[in-house]
């Protein structure tokens, strides 16, 4: 009898066990599609990024012009650039939905998978930040100046650290060249972390909407979920291509069409939309170090979610109080995103402070208390 190559070849059997014969719960919903969508985002970003890097020049005098040249003179350069810029937005949409799914259905109880996932989020944020600096427009320059300056809030070593990161006494040519090097390198770190993330996931198997073990009732990943994933790919790529072709600058800042000028500060410095919620938390604290700590805590708080799980249920499917809190948290993050895009003046300051307070209160206090109350009400 001929050996089945797919199951016996050293490399093919790894792929087979991860993508073809993988035992999968039969009831996972479309919320479980976002992991594979993130994989597609990563591949498309690396491919478009590589093509852009072939034409980009990491020099303060030439960076802006090289991007303009790409859009004017390179075959489909405008399309590659628009796909790359908007692909970043889709990457963040998918990762936020993926994290939201994890919080709702208790996927964070796979602790290793969850912790690697949070590290992936931090790496993605770093990659997007250094990438935004590369076109060397006004918002690129001032965004880099403001965000790197936050490190100066670290006691004793802060100022030295910032000047070390800048490679001088301000954001200049050395900063741009090292940011380009980092922007090229970090996606490959993300690929490596993704493989670790998947390895830990396949140790325990996927969670499911009911939050109960499904070991007794699994189906193969292929053809059921391969087809389902391909549908997700088609829908997401259709949306990405539509945005890149019809409204490529919708999510960008018009300020970035002006070349960087250290002598002119834009009236309102703000990051890309996917960082606005964290930016609003940073701004809501009138102390520099306090703001930086709150900014870090807004993401690092995700590491604590497995420790704060007090419910006897894994998923929120049968927990109405926790569901209300979860959707309040979603609304809260949307409010923070909106406030982050507004100028620092009367109504927005207090709204931002209240939203920041409620963000941490919901995650750190109300979620565990609601779960304890539900345990009592359901006599668990």
Curated annotation (Swiss-Prot):
One Pfam family named in its UniProt record: Cytochrome_B
- What's the superkingdom here? Eukaryota
Cofactor notes: Binds 2 heme b groups non-covalently.
Q: Where mainly located?
A: mitochondrion
CDD domains given for it?
A: cytochrome_b_C (cd00290), Cytochrome_b_N (cd00284)
For biological process, the GO terms are: mitochondrial electron transport, ubiquinol to cytochrome c
What is a single molecular function from GO for this protein? Answer: metal ion binding
Task: Give the signal peptide range.
Answer: none
Q: Which cofactor does it need?
A: heme b
Q: Where are the transmembrane segments?
A: 34-54, 78-99, 114-134, 179-199, 227-247, 289-309, 321-341, 348-368
Q: Where does heme b b566 bind?
A: 98, 197
Location comes to:
Mitochondrion inner membrane
The membrane topology of this protein is: Multi-pass membrane protein
Q: Does the keyword Heme apply?
A: yes
**Is Thylakoid among the key words of this record?**
no
Q: Indicate the family of this protein.
A: Belongs to the cytochrome b family.
| Subunit structure and binding partners | The cytochrome bc1 complex contains 11 subunits: 3 respiratory subunits (MT-CYB, CYC1 and UQCRFS1), 2 core proteins (UQCRC1 and UQCRC2) and 6 low-molecular weight proteins (UQCRH/QCR6, UQCRB/QCR7, UQCRQ/QCR8, UQCR10/QCR9, UQCR11/QCR10 and a cleavage product of UQCRFS1). This cytochrome bc1 complex then forms a dimer.
One further remark on this entry is:
Heme 1 (or BL or b562) is low-potential and absorbs at about 562 nm, and heme 2 (or BH or b566) is high-potential and absorbs at about 566 nm.
Job of this protein: Component of the ubiquinol-cytochrome c reductase complex (complex III or cytochrome b-c1 complex) that is part of the mitochondrial respiratory chain. The b-c1 complex mediates electron transfer from ubiquinol to cytochrome c. Contributes to the generation of a proton gradient across the mitochondrial membrane that is then used for ATP synthesis.
Q: What name does this protein carry? A: Cytochrome b
Question: What is the species of this protein?
Answer: Passer montanus
